[in-house]
């Protein structure tokens, strides 16, 4: 078992380990127990009732966090011609095709998200082994393969503004950063509810029994706080209505 420092242990003493917290209480407590001297990421960890070995039980989707992630998102767009011009005007950080493919093959990965125009996927597809394992590969399911150039500014704006992809890991848990410690409680709650609502909507058809088993929130360095799942799902549904 890893040894924790004094501040971590003191933070843990403020949490009732057997209690399931309502969202408002959890967010308030979370800010109180975050002790690091940097702007920690606020994390949510959702344990799902799925068998990740089964293809029809995979959870993979996106959510637009209404208050963003708290970090600057560098977006790369694989586009040429008119789409290249539109991407640059819409605020893409890197735009091109052949030159970017070559740079990525050489090990360059200084971006946080990637979009590809559909007509460039023939060239981009070969990057799957490099980008796929890092969650950077453009994908139709996540909306990052664009067919109509008129849709490009909207997709780019969503990524810049807080659109993030989530997926289950090999143990059936989804991990997502939903903001920073410097966010207000309303902002953290808003992002939490948006994620939980998106997670509910992403329930796979093959999932049986209880889908959302546990929800835990924490900051980068803090202990976790266990949420009351039914109360959180209900609050997320009300917020989305």
Can you describe what each PLM-predicted range is?
Residues 21-85, 112:
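Translation machinery proteins
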Residues 26, 87, 132, 217:
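Residue-level signature of catalytic and energy-coupling elements of molecular machines
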Residues 92-202:
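Long, charge-patterned amphipathic alpha-helical coiled-coil/hairpin "stalk" segments used as oligomerization
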Residues 1-19, 32, 38, 43:
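C-terminal alpha-helical interaction appendages
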């Amino acid at each position: 078992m890893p040894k924790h420092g004094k501040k971590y242990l003191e933070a843990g003493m403020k949490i009732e380990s057997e209690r399931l917290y309502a969202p408002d209480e959890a967010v308030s407590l979370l800010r109180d127990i975050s002790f690091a001297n940097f702007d920690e990421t606020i994390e949510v960890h959702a344990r799902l009732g799925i068998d990740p070995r089964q293809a029809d039980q995979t959870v993979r989707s996106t959510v637009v966090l209404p208050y963003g992630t708290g970090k600057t998102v560098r977006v790369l767009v694989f586009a040429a011609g008119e789409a290249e011009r539109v991407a640059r005007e819409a605020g893409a950080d890197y735009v091109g095709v052949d030159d970017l493919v070559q740079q990525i093959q050489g090990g360059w990965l200084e971006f946080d998200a990637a979009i590809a125009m559909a007509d460039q996927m023939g060239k981009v597809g070969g990057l799957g082994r490099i980008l796929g394992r890092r969650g950077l590969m453009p994908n139709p399911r996540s909306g990052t393969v664009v067919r109509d150039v008129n849709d490009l500014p909207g997709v780019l704006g969503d990524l810049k503004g807080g659109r993030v992809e989530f997926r289950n890991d090999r143990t059936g848990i989804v991990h997502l950063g939903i903001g920073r410690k410097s966010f207000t409680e309303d902002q953290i709650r808003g992002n939490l509810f948006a994620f939980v609502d998106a997670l509910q909507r992403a329930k796979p058809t093959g999932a049986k029994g209880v889908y959302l088993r546990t929800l835990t929130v924490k900051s980068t360095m803090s202990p976790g706080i266990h949420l009351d799942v039914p109360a959180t799902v209900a609050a997320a549904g009300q917020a989305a209505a």
